[in-house]
Each structure stands twice: as C-alpha cells, then as structure tokens.
Curated annotation (Swiss-Prot):
Name of the top EC class for this enzyme: lyase
N6-carboxylysine PTM positions: K121
Name of protein: Dihydroxy-acid dehydratase
Cofactor(s) named in the record: [2Fe-2S] cluster; Mg(2+)
Organism: Campylobacter curvus (strain 525.92)
Length: 557
C-alpha cells in the first residue's frame, strides 16, 4: 500500500502515534487509507450540505474495510462573485484547489481518493489535482438544483434572474416581478439547474469514466443522490489497491475525446473548453484547441438545456434517460468519435455502462435523426482577431450565425456594464471587452452581467460580444470569448478602436477585423497595454505565471 510509508515499521512509531490521536486502532493500520476531498462551504448553494454528504460517504467507506480521512478545499461561487472584483478570483481558485489536493494526498501518502465537488471551478480543479496524485479515484458531486417556477408556472433559473436585471432597467418588468424571479430562481441546494459550467463538468466526469452513472443528473438533496454517494463509498474500497483504476489509466486520451464528444452533443458551457485543455495537460494528453472543430463537425447536437432552451433543465435530462441515454444515442452514429471500449471506475467499459439505455423523452433528448443541429454546440473561431483561437457556444446563438458590425470598445467589464446600461450599445454593434484575459484581468472574469444586460434589453439577436475574458455557462447570444492572444500580451483585440468593422462567421469558423496591414502595423507600433493596479498578492502571483486561454489558462511550472 502507498500508505505503508506512514504506518509500517518501527521507524514509523511517531507517525502511528499521531494517527492514533485521531482515533485509529491497531487494526486500522492494515487497511487502505482513503482521502475524501470535500468542498463544503456555506456560502455556495451547491456546497452548503456537502458536510452531511461527506459523513454518509465516510460511513460507507468504514463499513467496507477502509479508513477515510476528510479534508477540504476552498470554493468560489461564480454567481455570487459575478459582476464585481470577486470574479477575479474564480479561475485562479482552480489552481489553489488542484494544489490543495496534490499537497494533502502526497504529504500523507493516502492510497485512494474520493472527490466531492459540485460547482464551477471546483470540479476541474479537483480533476487536475487528482491527476497529479494518480491513485484510484472516484468523483461524486453534490448534484444539480431543482428548477424554479414563477407563480404562473413558468420554469426559471439563475440565468432568468440575471436577464431580469436588464428587463427591469428597460421597464419590461416591474420591481415586484423582479423580486418574484429573485425569490424563485434558485429553489433548493445544488449546482444551478441549467447546463452551466458546474453541471457541464459533472456530466463530463461521467463521460470520462471517473464518476458513476447519474453523477451529472441525479438531483441534490434526494435519497437517490445519497444512494449514489454510498455506491461511491463502496466502490472506492473495491478499487483502492487496484492499479487499473488509477485515474490516469481511466482519464486517458480516449476519455478526453469522449468528454468533448458529449460536450458537443449537449452544448455545454464554453468554460469546458478551457477546463478540458487544462485537464488534458495534467493527464499528459496533447489536446490542441484547433482539434475541437473536427469533433464538433462529426457530432450532432441532440440535447438543448437552459440557457440554450430555457424550459429544459438537468432534472429533465435525468428523467429522459440521463447521460447514459445521451451517450448511447451518440454512439448510434458510428463514426469512431466515441471510444466505448474505455474503462470506467465502475469496472465496466463505457459501452457496457450505457448498455441498453434508451431515451425516455425525445422532446428532451433528441434522436440523432432529429438533432437540433448536425454539428456540435461549441465551436472554435480563428482569424486576425484570434490567431490562437476563441470559443463560442453555438447552442446559445439566438440570432444569425454571420454578423458584421462596428466595434464599441471597453477596457474592462465594469466599463462595459456601465456603457450597455447607459445605452451606448445599439443594434448592429460588436461589444468588445478586453483586458479581461487570464493575465490582463487577471483571472479571466466571466461576462454574464454584460451578456444578460444585452439579452434583457432585447438586443440579443442584434448585438455580438467578443472578449478575451470568458462567459458563464448561463450566457447565451452571439458571445465569443477566450480570444487569444489576449490584449495584455499584445493581441489584436487590444488594437481595436471604436468603429472598426468586425466580421464573424460561425459556419466558416472565422473572426476578423477589417484593417489594412499598414494600419495594423501602425497600431502595433503605438500600442501600450493598459496597466491595472492589483491589490491582491495572489492575483499578482497568478498574473506572472498564467498562460493564455488557448493553453487552458494553466500556470507555467
């Protein structure tokens, strides 16, 4: 056992003495030691109950002959951090979480690991940390939130609440209606109910084989979720000493491909591109952002979930057959994109796991023949505005897929929010938000507030938004993020001026600004990047080490 280094032999008497102080007995030193990486935090709706779930998990681990040791990671709620300086810390928190797991697991030589994330950057951060440790690992999240309803019975969620702000500003809804949405959009604990970043990543954990079936769709705070946690506790004890289930043996190149295939089929959050690039690098997989379009071109988009389809939520996907039904349906298009032979933590191959699964509601999960689109729900655009690529969630486009318009430039998200609210942006404009990339922000803020204001003001089909920052999974519209190179590193987005004509064509994967070579060279010679005053020491450290979005915004070693 890996843990023998802290518990076997006479030289480890001091170590055992310390472990006895935690309650261990003689018989425990012959058992596998299991790390339980929890992310309990009271301010996050998807996490405030994870302390109770961890107790259920640890109890099951003890019953099955192993010794659990719970530790905690930090967490940031992107929704609460949205639209102010707190969002600067969201993406950097991913690295702290990864470092935390690497530190605790390796410092104490634990044999196996169960990760209990749920929201936003916590899932990818834990995956990255687990890959560094490389022991048998199971992911079991806290589960998605129920959707909310208005008094009239209309389904709503967090995206509704953000867009309601713009509607209130334009007097489309009253203060009373805004309050009704506020009080009903998030009716229970869990990860926000749409196909936002948290639920996107939790479903991809199923596709990668590192979580048990149902991880992405079984609702939080239900008996079914508690049983899933018990199953994870039993299973980790079965595989704790089996090298076949080291996470790098499960999350390999084929698993990365499977995750991206499922992501395209479901129109996941654009953040998944950033996180899968980072995860692939930790897994030793050479994934390039340019490869994603080939996957998208071969995968039908068969499930639309809020915000792309506001009435459909994760509980509906679960009711319609869950991820197994989605994966089974994708596999019917026999084009070699899915690797059904890949092993999962349950001991089954992915193909065996989905088995005889079938769609129970074709209005929620479509057949391939009746797909929303013959191509996937995400795309990577290239051009003189994004030589290293940028990302758009095509599943969320509400207007035309081809757009040309005049640039309206802002050097921060705060400037953009003020400009949109004051009416500076009109039909036919391309909103440019720059100096919000991984290094320029720093921290690559999510632009849900600006995009929600655009939608709420009725401009969703008539305005495009481009940024070197990123978007919440709740964003919809012609919103293009992750532009690389970013403004802070001299990218073309930093050279744009108000009135420049920008051409976007999603179907040809292109994004360009109409500038002559002479004008471009002139602007480059005159370019001086905006320098922001940073008060946080961690943000200054992060800014020095972070790479751009085309590399997953990972830190340089």
């Amino acid at each position: 056992m890996r843990s023998d280094v802290i518990k076997k032999g006479y030289t480890r008497a001091p170590h055992r003495s310390l472990l006895r102080a935690t309650g261990l007995k003689d018989e425990d030193f012959s058992k596998p030691f299991i790390g339980v990486a929890n992310s309990f935090i009271e301010i996050i709706p998807g996490h405030f109950f994870l302390n109770k779930y961890a107790e259920i998990l640890k109890d099951e681990i003890r019953k099955n002959g192993c010794v659990p040791f719970e530790f905690n990671t930090i967490g940031v709620d992107d929704g609460i951090a949205m639209g102010h300086g707190g969002m600067l810390y969201s993406l950097p928190s991913r690295e702290i979480i990864a470092n935390s797991i690497e530190t605790v697991m390796n410092a104490h030589a634990l044999d196996a690991l169960v990760c209990m994330p749920n929201c936003d950057k916590i899932v990818p951060g834990m995956v990255m940390g687990a890959l560094r440790v490389n022991v048998p690992t199971i992911f079991v999240s806290g589960g998605p939130m129920r959707k909310g309803y208005t008094k009239s019975g209309q389904p709503i969620d967090l995206a509704t609440a953000f867009e309601a702000v713009g509607k209130f500003e334009t007097k489309e809804i009253s203060e009373e209606e805004l309050k009704e949405i506020e009080c009903n959009a998030c009716p229970s604990g869990g990860s926000c109910s749409g196909m936002f970043t948290a639920n996107s990543m939790n479903t991809l954990c199923e596709a990668m084989g590192i979580a048990l079936s149902g991880n992405g769709t079984i609702l939080a705070l239900t008996k079914e979720r508690e049983e899933l946690i018990r199953r994870a506790g039993r299973r980790i004890c079965e595989i704790a000493l089996d090298e076949r289930f080291k996470i790098r043996n499960i999350l390999n190149e084929k698993a990365v491909r499977n995750a991206l295939v499922v992501d395209m089929a479901m129109g996941g959050s654009s953040n998944t591109v950033l996180h899968m690039l980072a995860i692939s690098r930790e897994a030793g997989v050479n994934l390039q952002i340019s490869q994603l379009n080939k996957i998208s071109q071969n995968i039908a988009h068969i499930a639309k979930i809020s915000p792309s389809l506001p009435n459909v939520h994760m509980e509906d996907i679960g009711r319609a057959g869950g991820m197994n039904a989605v994966i089974k349906e994708i596999s019917r298009r026999d084009n070699g994109m899915l690797h059904l032979e890949n092993l999962t933590v349950s001991g089954e191959t992915l193909g065996e796991r989905v088995g005889l699964s079938e769609i129970k509601d074709e209005s929620v999960i479509h057949k391939v023949e009746n797909a929303y689109s013959k191509v996937g729900g995400l795309a990577i655009l290239f051009g003189n505005l994004a030589e290293q690529g940028c990302v758009i969630k095509t599943a969320g486009i509400v207007g035309e897929r081809k757009f040309s318009g005049k640039a309206v430039c802002f050097n921060s998200q705060d400037e953009a929010i003020a400009g949109i609210s004051s009416g500076k942006v009109g039909k036919g404009d391309v909103v440019v938000i720059r100096y919000e990339g991984p290094r320029g922000g720093p921290g690559m803020q999510e632009m849900l507030s600006p995009t929600s204001l655009i939608m709420g003001r009725g401009l969703g089909a008539d305005v495009a938004l481009i940024t070197d920052g990123r978007f919440s999974g709740a964003t919809r519209g012609l919103s293009i993020g992750h532009i690389s190179p970013e403004a802070a590193e001299g990218g073309m987005i930093g050279l744009l001026r108000d009135g420049d004509i920008i051409d976007i064509d999603v179907d040809t994967y292109s994004i360009n600004v109409r500038l002559s070579e002479a004008e471009t060279l002139k602007r480059k010679a005159e370019f001086k990047p905006v320098q922001k005053e940073l008060k946080g020491k961690w943000l200054r450290q992060y800014q020095r080490l972070v790479t751009n979005a085309s590399n997953g915004a990972i830190l340089e070693a």
